[in-house]
Regions:
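Conserved pre-motif I regulatory segment
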Residues: 1-45
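The conserved Walker
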Residues: 46-50
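Gly/Ser/Thr-rich beta-alpha loop segments that engage phosphate groups in nucleotides
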Residues: 51-53, 110-111
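Conserved nucleic-acid-binding Ia/Ib motif block in the N-terminal RecA-like helicase ATPase lobe
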Residues: 8, 12-16, 69-119
Length: 119
């Protein structure tokens, strides 16, 4: 299945995928997309480099409202390195959008005031 087959995908996400030459969905992305869009909880497992981050970020982004400044999603990850990676991916995707969405990585053992200010 190709990302272009998804009718609900936002233009910004489509632009990000095109710029990164990502055309086909990976197995983990195909298996999880509809469940996440249907607001269902999932537990999925896949090897490194199979597209897990985009498997959950793309449907989350497609569900976000652009007319509010409230926190709409929280992604909880087990390590600071993964938090930074996920946040960088979000920032890359948001750069292809209308600048109404923002993200921040909040990491333990780091100055919380500065992190809160980044939200």
């Amino acid at each position: 299945m190709k990302f272009s087959d998804i009718e609900t995908i936002s233009h910004g996400v489509s632009d990000y995928l095109a710029d990164n030459k990502i055309v086909d969905m990976t197995e983990i992305q195909r298996q999880t997309y509809k469940h996440i869009m249907d607001n269902r909880d999932i537990i999925a497992c896949s090897s490194t480099g199979t597209g897990k981050t985009l498997a959950y970020l793309i449907p989350i982004i497609n569900r976000l409202r652009r007319d509010t400044h409230n926190i709409q999603a929280v992604v909880l990850v087990p390590t600071a390195e993964l938090a930074i990676q996920v946040n960088n991916t979000l920032k890359d995707i948001f750069a292809h959008m209308d600048n109404t969405l923002t993200s921040a990585a909040l990491i333990g053992d780091v100055n919380i005031s500065r992190q809160i200010d980044s939200i």
